[in-house]
Amino acid sequence: MIKHVLAAAAALALLVPAAANAELAQGAVAPDFTTMGALAGKPMKVNLKALLAKGPVVLYFYPKAFTSGCTMEAHAFAEATGDFAKAGATVLGMSNDDLPTLQKFSTAECRDKFAVAAATKDVIKAYDVSLKVAGIASGLTKRTSYVIAKNGKIVMVHSNMDYKDHVKLTLEAVKKLKKG
């Protein structure tokens, strides 16, 4: 009986797609996007190409505003915003939250230090950051950070649902970019 259960479970596992970590690869060109976002509670249009004209961009996707991990990650990025700025980089957080939620989150948790923007279905697909539960898209994004060089190429990718290393690793990558 146990053999049959194990065989059935193994066969079923082959049918259910695994939670792929198929984020965009280092060296890929970051897809451009324009979406709505918020900085210090004020709505704004966000365009990747325009941000890259100023320097590298740390684009980090987080699953849901005001959840514990996303709040702690926003606090960590807010505390490090000055370090990112010294390295010439702009930080942009993205989730599929609506604009009113992003406006509140940009003030309450991002502490008015950096913008957050709406990750549309097209952006989620383009960056391959759909959070899947049992192989089904949840509508949320995976916790994935990209460092995008001024030329639009991705120089660093970190995808891990634990927020703790995202700031450290992206800041290291930005500093390395600055050194050349």
List PLM regions with ranges.
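Short loop/turn microsegments at loop-to-beta-strand junctions
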Residues: 31, 56, 142-144
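Short, acidic, Ser/Thr-enriched surface-loop or helix-capping motifs
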Residues: 24, 38, 118, 148-149
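Structural microenvironment flanking redox-active thiols in thiol-disulfide oxidoreductases
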Residues: 71-112, 123-125
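Short, internal strand/loop/helix patches
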Residues: 106-142
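Short active-site neighborhood of thiol/selenol oxidoreductases, capturing the structured segment around
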Residues: 48-71
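N-proximal helix/coil linker or "cap" segments that precede and/or mark the start of modular domains
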Residues: 4-6, 11-37
